[in-house]
Amino acid sequence: MTSVVVVGSGFTGFECARQLARKMRRHAKSGASVDITIISPVDYMLYTPLLPDVAGGVVDARFVAIPLANTLRGVQAVRGRVDSVDFDGHTVTFTDPEERVRSVSWDRLVLTPGSVTRLFDVPGLAKHARGLKSTAEALYLRDHVLEQLELADVDDDPGRTAARRTIVVVGASYSGTELAVQLRALADSAAKQMNFDPADVNFVLLDLAEQVMPEVGEKLGAAAMRVLKSRGIDVRLGVTLKEVHAEHVVLTDDSLIRTHTVAWVTGVTGAPLIEKLGLPTEKGRLKVQTDLQVPGHPDVFAAGDAAAVPDVTQPGNITPPTAQHATRQGKVLGRNVAASLGYGKTKQYKHRNMGLVVDLGPRYAVANPLNIQLSGFPAKAVTRAYHLYAIPRFVNRRAVTLAYLTDMFFDRSVVSFGLSSKEDAQFAGSEGIPMPKPD
């Protein structure tokens, strides 16, 4: 039996496995027999665009996790971290949750390990900051912010109280901006229910760029800036972190901010596995052809955040690592892997940017679907409708819909469950990023 192994269960790997399984079912009567296996450290596909909503207490973490077991019909899901690939022997070696090393053979290999948070050589960053690429990180940020607000309420040291009530978010792209406004809304609910002035909670949003969310253009970026300022978020552009300590940060302009909470949301880079493969890369991502095949390896395909997919609409460029591209590349992957097995024709990946949607908290958003610039309530409606359309499972869509309705009419819950510890949410623990060894 022909064996197809998909590495990674993010948007691209999930969609590839789903499309390929559907195609094989359609060809089953003609004798098609393909064994599809997806290997991932987790048993779900994570809908990452809603992680700011998880951190802000709008959506439950379960609602953004799409289970592989009952969603990918005809696909065997295997828990494990892929460590290496033998391209000559056609085997993948991985470590399972009990630290047992196992291997599986393949006739076609699909490399979609995704991405991890891009870190820089900032002293203390890996130890004291947290990212937003996993449920562990989102849950930790939510619980940590609430815990700090609760501790500030009874702290007798004014300086430490102010530090507990100061949240620093680094990265004014759409993810970082969404996180800042959702945490701001969570803090406002906490202030209302815990009887303190919401103005006592300070939010600082940092970015080296000259504009907030340059992806949405100057007009919508300016609209977003007005919303951020109206909600009391201190936006500082052209500056970032120089040092991170347990109770303060130092910025590149040498100013100091006392804080106990630092969120690092500055972009992504290809998964660590990419460096181990010995294949050509571009900007830290695997080089692939327009049909998503790895050059020189006709049985190997790659796409998503881990691949430098040529953008045929902008010759010389590669597609950005967005959920929109990842999902659509997964569909083309499924088609092309099937074609390589003799079922159908190959297709090059070509997709024009359909625009972005950015949720800016209660009653506001900005969006540019099909280059139509929207802000305010119309953008909010488009943003939420898009997410409900894009979530690939009816049960999850229904749950998120109910969460949105609840958020419209009721205050957010300000309960800290402690489900994700500080160690769980470290970049190494939650994303698998190798950390620098201590001197």
Describe the predicted segments one by one.
Residues 1-84, 174-216, 263:
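Beta1-alpha1 glycine-rich phosphate/pyrophosphate-binding loop at the start
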Residues 5, 76-168, 263:
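FAD-binding core/adjacent interface of flavoenzyme oxidoreductases
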Residues 12, 114-117, 180, 268-270:
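Short glycine-rich anion-binding loops that position phosphate/pyrophosphate groups of nucleotides
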Residues 33-35, 75-92, 104, 184-290, ...:
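A Rossmann-like FAD-binding core segment of flavoenzymes
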Residues 38, 166-168, 173-186, 230, ...:
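Active-site substrate-recognition segment that forms the wall
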Residues 127-158, 247-250, 256-328:
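FAD-site-proximal beta/loop scaffold in flavoenzymes
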Residues 143-199:
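Rossmann-like NAD(P)H-binding beta-loop-alpha module
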Residues 325, 332-439:
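C-terminal, flexible cofactor-proximal segment of oxidoreductases
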